């Protein structure tokens, strides 16, 4: 094995060098130069400085403006809550540990940080699954004219949290474990060792199969069918022009959110699975750290996407920031946009479609 396994850690460097020390007790500057840890600090600070306010503002705007409290927006709020979990309980911890060059909070802190990072990512993924299924049912109409109600939205949210806990909780209960990864200043599930006491292999297969492959397949199936349906409707003029436009644009927004998530998390998933299937392979701490830290950027994608692509939401956010006034004068435009979307709302009971 080209790494060193401890009681509750795995350092990707052989102890033949005599340099390896516990990542809970000593700086890990033998894995990467100190300046690389400072770069991580700057990057995480940027995510905290931008992600925390924009997700809090997303929640504030949604609760303040009654017209935004539509069933499909509940899922978007759920995404914002997941991103806040990651920012508050994941990013802040990673910033401090990277600043010190090792996981200063010990094994318990590592388990907590790994849990919240996994939980936040899973809530985001399963929320996108719910959005994809909603788009498929509303646009493709396999169940007729389906009305997406508040009850359906709350059921979807409950489902996302159930699935997320079923992924993030097992390592806290003895099925696998959370250990420092990469540069040893953030934590994740143990993809690295074959420790029989924790049954790591079965957990990793379960996690990749149930909590990555299946959701991604459902998302791609839903949007594959949806794109075909939108094209058919456009060719046959089955819907009014305004309804077609609104459905296309809300679909485009959700697809961008899915692509943003996949862009952030797929590199991490692929590198982790490669390490898992090639136990003992020689890899640098940076190899795992780069995709691990890049995956955290997903907390910025979703609010930016639906603020940029949803004119009504964007207008509400600007008026909230500017104390009730929109200096860009979009109120009238937003009102007309909202009016034109009532046809979509009558089907999906939602007004998230952008203009």
UniProtKB/Swiss-Prot annotation:
Residues 332-355 are annotated as: Disordered. It holds the Pfam family Rhodopsin_N. Residues 62-73, 134-152, 231-252, 310-355 are cytoplasmic. Residues 334-355 have a biased composition (Low complexity). A lipid is attached at residues 322-323 (S-palmitoyl cysteine). Residues 1-36, 99-113, 177-202, 277-284 are extracellular. InterPro entries: GPCR_opsins, GPCR_Rhodpsn, GPCR_Rhodpsn_7TM, Opsin, Retinal_BS, Rhodopsin, Rhodopsin_N. Keywords: Chromophore, Disulfide bond, G-protein coupled receptor, Glycoprotein, Lipoprotein, Membrane, Palmitate, Phosphoprotein, Photoreceptor protein, Receptor, Retinal protein, Sensory transduction, Transducer, Transmembrane, Transmembrane helix, Vision. GO terms for molecular function: G protein-coupled photoreceptor activity. It is found in: Membrane. Glycans are attached at residues 2, 15, 200. It is a multi-pass membrane protein. One of its GO terms (cellular component) is plasma membrane. Disulfide bonds join 110-187. The chain crosses the membrane at residues 37-61, 74-98, 114-133, 153-176, 203-230, 253-276, 285-309. Phosphorylated on some or all of the serine and threonine residues present in the C-terminal region. The modification N6-(retinylidene)lysine is found at residue 296. GO terms for biological process: absorption of visible light; cellular response to light stimulus; G protein-coupled receptor signaling pathway; light absorption; phototransduction; visual perception. The keyword Zinc does not apply. Visual pigments are the light-absorbing molecules that mediate vision. They consist of an apoprotein, opsin, covalently linked to cis-retinal. This opsin uses a vitamin A2 chromophore. Belongs to the G-protein coupled receptor 1 family. Opsin subfamily. This is Blue-sensitive opsin.
């Amino acid at each position: 094995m080209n790494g060193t396994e401890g009681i509750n850690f795995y350092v990707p460097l052989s102890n033949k060098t005599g340099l390896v020390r516990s990542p809970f007790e000593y700086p890990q500057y033998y894995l990467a130069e100190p300046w690389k840890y400072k770069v991580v600090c700057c990057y995480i600070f940027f995510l905290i400085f931008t992600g925390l306010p924009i997700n809090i503002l997303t929640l504030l705007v949604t609760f303040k403006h009654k017209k935004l409290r539509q069933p499909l927006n509940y899922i978007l709020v759920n995404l914002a809550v997941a991103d806040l979990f990651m920012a508050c309980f994941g990013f802040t911890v990673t910033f401090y540990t990277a600043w010190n060059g090792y996981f200063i909070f010990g094994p318990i802190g590592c388990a907590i940080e790994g849990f919240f990072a996994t939980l936040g990512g899973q809530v985001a993924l399963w929320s996108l699954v719910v959005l994809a299924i909603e788009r498929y049912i509303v646009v493709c109409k396999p169940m007729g004219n389906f009305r997406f109600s508040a009850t359906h939205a709350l059921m979807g949210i409950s489902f996302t949290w159930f699935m997320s806990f079923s992924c993030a909780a097992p390592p806290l209960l003895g099925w696998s474990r959370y250990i420092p990864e990469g540069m040893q200043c953030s934590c994740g599930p143990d993809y690295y060792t074959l420790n029989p006491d924790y049954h790591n292999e079965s957990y990793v297969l379960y996690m990749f199969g149930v909590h990555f492959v299946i959701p991604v397949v459902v998302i791609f199936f839903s949007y594959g069918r949806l794109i075909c349906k939108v094209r058919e409707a456009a060719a046959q003029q089955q819907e009014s022009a305004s309804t077609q436009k609104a459905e296309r644009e809300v679909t485009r927004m959700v697809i961008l959110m899915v692509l943003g998530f996949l862009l952030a998390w797929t590199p991490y998933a692929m590198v982790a699975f490669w390490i898992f299937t090639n136990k003992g392979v020689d890899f640098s701490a940076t190899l795992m750290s780069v995709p691990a830290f890049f995956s955290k950027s997903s907390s910025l994608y979703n609010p930016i996407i639906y603020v940029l692509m949803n004119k009504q939401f964007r207008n509400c956010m600007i008026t909230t920031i500017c104390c009730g006034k929109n200096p860009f004068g979009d109120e009238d435009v937003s009102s007309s946009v909202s009016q034109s979307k009532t046809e979509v709302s009558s089907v999906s009971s939602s007004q998230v479609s952008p203009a």
